[in-house]
A protein has these predicted regions:
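Short, hydrophobic/amphipathic alpha-helical patches that form generic packing surfaces
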Residues: 105-108, 178-185, 484-492, 612-626
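PAPS-dependent sulfotransferase catalytic core
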Residues: 548-606
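ATP-dependent adenylate-handling active sites, centered on carboxylate activation for C-N bond formation
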Residues: 7-21, 89, 109, 129-155, ...
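N-terminal glutamine amidotransferase
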Residues: 1-76, 105-224, 247-251, 274-280, ...
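Short active-site loop/helix that positions an aromatic residue
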Residues: 83-84, 521
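Short Ser/Thr-interspersed hydrophobic loop/turn segments at strand-loop and sheet-helix junctions
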Residues: 46-56, 124, 140, 256, ...
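Structural motif
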Residues: 91-98, 169, 173-174, 237, ...
């Protein structure tokens, strides 16, 4: 994995190499093994390299034989050897053994039809000198990020927003609607923190015609088509096919010319990956886990149980290491927010960053279990949405009365977290529908609470739910929720966190469950194969039961939680008082000093406001990081 950046001047000015090199500076941690730049006519392509495959000859930007096609590429193509063989038969000539060069020739052969042939994760830019076109592309799941902006004079792109900010034409105006949405969800679900900066969506490509300066974005992967056309297959045959695909995905992700390991939690997904990887590796498998001092959040015992169970499949042994989270190091959070270039308040970014740094001392590549919950209906909200949908036969007026009556019986003094808070969010869903129902379940900070501590800078903001239920992407039924998460939560939260944390440590993170063949098969399965009678991830746990310790499959899922409430009453108490009431958020009008102080006081008095406070703190850190 690497960092890419570049720009195309749309006027007659030749590109300045120093601008490109400046854009690469914030991405040194993404690619510590080398830097490359290429100026070709109006186009400037740059690259920071983390060497994983073909260590000696894979430097970028890279071109074809005659220099008419250039690429800068971030990611891994796992079937590149197969593609290389096929392209050789068609007359293509290669100078390296790298997957990057395969992409160049695949583009020559198939143009924008090339994506159907790829197995892997990627974000890349290809400049075609002959046609005067620039192509940007991002993988189906959105594992690798890619941002861009366009003005009348320039089109620029990069793996990170801080890299884009180094371009003199960067449009700095903030997207306040995106920041408003962030305060509810803890991530930005659509767009970016900047009004004129775009994020290339997963499974999409952008083609810019330099002759006409027109850019068009198209989707090459449409998961809703698979979701709507379910396979006619027996459960037994589906289990066999799933095992074959996941095994292949794990085997491909074990290919590397550097040391690799596995991230192991106390859950099902990573236990499956660890068991399969242990079975396939030719050396001792290194597994890494995170632990907390706070027992409620600590998974070290269940992670150790998973490691012990996986050890029986290891042909060459298994080494398990555990890292305990240090809550005192707030600098980790500030660094990650600055590197990401946007506010991001999924608190598990902190332990994930510490885990990546811990693992990087021994390995360069790590496998994880991201994506299984979205593919196989692992989240509680999927069941909650199904149960709530059963109330839709009642008249809307009656449902609203029921909601009000039930919620009035549930005390509200406990704050945003805990079982009572979850119950309130669930029962409010009886009186709602579609996106409003979904957001009521997943939003940690509701509209009314936000308005209590936000200032005039957020006046006129639309409710977050209006951003979701659109004509292009209607929300639909409860069965569509995983598709919705594929567009928003997975790429914008889970994978953004994984990319930011791993790249900060120069570590490549791979997830077999995000293999395109696994995803497409999972999406096309009947829903009762994935969830039945409260058994979530049914087909996954049944298929790989031998790799799971007894009882794990039915154990209640524990999210990757962080003890924020305790930290805000302990190690981070003074941090809130020092940073929030008179910080950049208050100066910009985004926060109300009185509202913030009241929020802090409520939390210290026992009403859990940790989600709202953490989102506010992160937004403050972001605003502080972009001060002139």
């Amino acid at each position: 994995m690497c960092g890419i950046a570049g720009f195309v001047n749309l006027n007659s000015e030749p590109p300045q190499e120093q601008i490109l090199r400046n854009m690469l500076i914030p991405m040194i941690c993404r690619g510590p093994d080398g830097e490359g730049v290429r100026i070709s006519g109006p186009a400037a392509l740059g690259h920071r390299r983390l060497a994983v495959i073909d260590l000696l000859s894979g430097a970028q930007p890279m071109c074809n034989e005659d220099g008419s096609v250039w690429i800068t590429f971030n990611g891994e193509i796992f079937n590149y050897r197969e593609l290389r063989t096929r392209l050789l038969r068609k007359g293509h000539r290669f100078r390296t053994e790298s997957d990057t060069e395969v992409l160049v020739h695949l583009y020559e052969e198939y143009g924008t039809e090339m994506f159907a042939h790829l197995s892997g994760f990627y974000a890349f830019a290809i400049y075609n000198v002959s046609s005067g076109k620039l192509l940007l592309a991002r993988d189906c799941a959105g594992v690798k990020p890619l941002f861009y902006f366009q003005t009348p004079e320039v089109f620029a792109f990069a793996s990170t927003i801080p890299a884009l900010r180094r371009h003199p034409a960067f449009p700095h105006e903030l997207n306040r609607q995106a920041l408003w949405d962030f305060l509810s969800l803890q991530y930005i679900p659509q767009g970016t923190a900047y009004r004129k900066v775009r994020r290339l969506e997963p499974g999409s490509f952008l083609e810019l015609n330099l002759n006409g300066s027109s850019a068009a974005v198209r989707r090459f992967w449409k998961p809703e088509t698979l979701h709507e056309n379910k396979l006619q297959i027996s459960y037994r045959d589906a289990c066999a096919e799933l095992e074959k695909r996941v095994r292949q995905a794990v085997a491909e992700r074990l290919i590397a010319d550097v040391p690799l390991g596995v991230f192991l939690s106390g859950g099902v997904d990573s236990a499956i990956v660890a068991g399969l990887a242990a079975e396939m590796t030719d050396s001792p498998l290194h597994c890494y886990s995170i632990a907390f001092r706070e027992k409620t959040y600590d998974e070290r015992e269940s992670a150790a149980e998973n490691a012990a169970w996986a050890r029986q499949f290891a042909r060459h042994g298994l080494i398990h290491r555990i890292q305990e989270v240090d809550p005192c190091d707030i600098s980790i959070l500030e660094k990650r927010i600055a590197e990401y270039g946007q506010p991001f308040a999924d608190a598990s970014l902190i332990p994930t960053s510490q885990l990546c740094a811990f693992a990087r001392s021994e390995v360069t590549v790590a496998l994880g279990g991201d994506g299984a919950d979205e593919m196989f209906r692992g989240y509680e909200r999927y069941m909650a949405m199904r149960y709530l949908e059963k109330s839709d036969f009642l008249p809307a007026a009656l449902r609203k009365i029921l909601t009000g009556t039930i919620c009035s019986l549930l005390p509200d003094h406990g704050g945003e977290r805990g079982s009572l808070a979850r119950a309130r969010r669930f029962f409010r869903g009886i009186g709602a529908s579609g996106a409003e129902r979904y957001l009521g379940i997943v939003s940690h900070t509701g509209e009314s609470l936000k308005r209590r501590f936000c200032g005039s800078g957020f006046e006129g903001m639309r409710p977050t739910l209006e951003q979701f239920d659109t004509e292009e992407h209607p929300f639909g039924k409860a069965g569509d929720v995983p598709l919705f998460d594929l567009r928003t939560y997975l790429p914008c939260d889970i994978l953004a966190k994984a990319d930011t944390a791993s790249m900060s440590a120069s570590l490549e993170l791979r997830s077999p469950f995000l293999d395109r063949r696994v995803m497409e098969f999972a999406l096309s399965l009947p829903e009762n194969f994935k969830e039945q009678n409260g058994h979530r991830k049914r087909i996954l746990t049944d298929t790989f039961a031998r790799y799971l310790p007894p009882g794990l499959a039915r154990r209640r899922k524990r999210g990757f939680g962080v003890p924020l409430a305790d930290w805000f009453r302990g190690e981070w108490k003074n941090l809130l008082l020092e940073r929030l009431p008179q910080g950049e958020g208050e100066k910009s009008g985004m926060f109300s000093k009185t509202g913030i102080e009241q929020l802090i006081a409520e939390h210290q008095a026992g009403c859990d406001r940790s989600y709202a406070l953490f989102s506010a703190l992160v937004l403050e850190m972001f605003l502080d990081s972009i001060k002139p």
